[in-house]
C-alpha cells in the first residue's frame, strides 16, 4: 500500500450480513478517525437465481443470501453511520453533517434472466433511498444511490467472455464503465449538496431489457 495512504486507509474484516460485525466496523472507524462524514455501502453479490429451470424452481436459500448481503448489509451500515453522523458538527454553511451512499444497479429497473434475487435486492436499495433521506433530513444527512450499468470490475469479470462481449457491443460506447468513472460519480454525489433522495444511473446508455 502506498506510503502516502497508510494513515488514510483502514481495513476491518466484516461480514455485512451480521449486524454486530457492521457495528464493530463503524465503531473501529470512529475510534481510528474520530468520526464519519461519508459512508458508501458497496458490498454486494450477483448470484444467479433463475425462477425455474430443468433443474428445479427458484433456490430460495440463495435468494435469501443475496438479499441479506445486498440489502440488510447496506441497511446495517446506514443505521450505524447515521448515528455517528447525527452527532457531527456542520461541515459547511448549509449545515451538512454527512452523506450516505448506496450502490444500486440498472438491474433494479430492467429485467435480466436469471437475476431474480439481484434485481429484487437492487430494487430494494432504490426503495430505501427516499424514505431514509426524509428521515435523516432533520439531521442534515443526505442519502442517495448510484446505479451502475456494466463496469470493468472483478464481479463483471466472472461472467463468460461471450456475455461480456455481447454486453459491451450493446453499449453505445462499446465498452464497460471504468472504476475511475464510478469513483468520479461518488465524488460528485459527495460534493453536490443538493443530491438527495435519488438513485442516479451511470450506464453509458446501456439497456438490459432484452437480456
Language-model region placement:
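Catalytic Tyr-X3-Lys loop
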Residues: 45, 56-76, 101, 125
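Conserved mid-core segment of classical short-chain dehydrogenase/reductases
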Residues: 46-64, 83, 87-93, 114-117, ...
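Active-site helix of classical SDR
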Residues: 78, 121
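Alpha-helical segment proximal to the catalytic Tyr-Lys
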Residues: 83, 134-135
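Residue(s) in the substrate-gating loop at a strand-loop-helix junction
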Residues: 105
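Active-site loop-to-helix junction immediately N-terminal to the catalytic Tyr of the SDR YXXXK motif
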Residues: 110-119, 131
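Short, small/polar-rich loop/turn modules that mediate ligand/substrate recognition or access, typified
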Residues: 137-142, 195-198
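C-terminal substrate-recognition "lid" of short-chain dehydrogenase/reductases
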Residues: 175-202, 207
Amino acid at each position: 500500500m502506498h506510503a502516502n495512504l497508510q494513515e488514510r486507509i483502514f481495513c476491518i474484516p466484516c461480514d455485512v450480513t451480521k449486524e454486530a460485525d457492521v457495528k464493530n466496523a463503524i465503531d473501529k472507524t470512529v475510534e481510528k478517525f474520530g468520526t464519519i462524514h461519508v459512508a458508501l455501502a458497496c458490498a454486494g453479490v450477483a448470484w444467479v437465481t433463475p425462477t425455474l429451470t430443468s433443474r428445479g424452481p427458484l433456490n430460495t436459500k440463495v435468494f435469501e443470501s443475496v438479499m441479506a448481503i445486498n440489502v440488510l448489509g447496506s441497511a446495517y451500515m446506514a443505521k450505524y453511520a447515521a448515528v455517528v453522523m447525527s452527532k457531527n458538527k456542520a461541515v459547511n454553511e448549509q449545515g451538512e453533517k454527512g452523506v450516505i451512499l448506496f450502490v444500486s444497479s440498472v438491474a433494479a429497473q430492467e429485467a435480466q434472466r436469471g437475476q431474480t434475487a439481484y434485481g429484487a435486492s437492487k430494487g430494494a436499495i432504490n426503495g430505501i433511498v427516499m424514505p431514509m433521506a426524509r428521515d435523516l433530513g432533520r439531521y442534515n444527512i443526505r442519502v442517495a444511490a448510484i446505479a451502475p450499468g456494466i463496469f470493468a470490475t472483478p464481479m463483471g469479470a466472472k461472467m463468460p467472455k461471450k456475455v461480456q462481449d455481447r454486453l459491451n457491443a450493446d453499449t453505445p460506447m462499446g465498452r464497460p464503465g471504468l472504476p475511475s468513472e464510478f469513483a468520479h460519480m461518488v465524488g460528485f454525489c459527495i460534493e453536490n449538496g443538493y443530491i438527495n433522495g435519488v438513485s442516479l444511473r451511470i450506464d453509458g446508455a446501456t439497456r438490459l431489457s432484452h437480456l
